[in-house]
A protein has these predicted regions:
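Catalytic core of pol beta-like nucleotidyltransferases
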Residues: 1-43, 49-56, 65-117
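Residue-level detector of short, conserved catalytic/binding motifs and their immediate flanks
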Residues: 59
């Protein structure tokens, strides 16, 4: 398969996800709360929310929980679970963090364009 064919396929899949965004956001939220508990908050942020989403953009989702692991191994297992059943070309970039890191780091970069799911 040529590189251009891969890009075209990725764009088609991304358009399908965007068209039905809530169909995909709700399972992510439900799974996050199931595995990390009811204190978990899920947010949409980044270029998609700002309205300057382009062909190479992703859809940024931030999962904030007191139970969020710090270690990469545990974190990657949760991230895989949150995107279970999605296409390999899915446009979601899921960030998993604790409330402390959210307050002290993410809020420095995310000023106003953030929406709780």
């Amino acid at each position: 398969m040529r590189y251009i064919d891969l890009l075209i396929e990725r764009q088609k899949v991304t358009e399908r996800y965007i068209k039905n965004i809530n169909k995909y956001l709700q399972p992510i939220k439900k799974r996050a709360k199931k595995i990390l508990g009811n204190g978990t908050k899920v947010y949409l942020f980044g270029s998609f929310l700002k309205g300057n989403f382009g062909p190479n953009s992703d859809i940024d989702i931030l999962v904030v929980s007191p139970k969020a692991p710090i270690k990469a191994g545990k974190k990657s297992g949760i991230l895989l679970y949150l995107k279970r059943g999605f296409s390999v070309y899915n446009p979601f970039e899921i960030h998993l963090t604790t409330p402390e890191i959210f307050e002290n780091w993410y809020k420095k970069f995310i000023k106003k364009d953030i929406k709780e799911i």
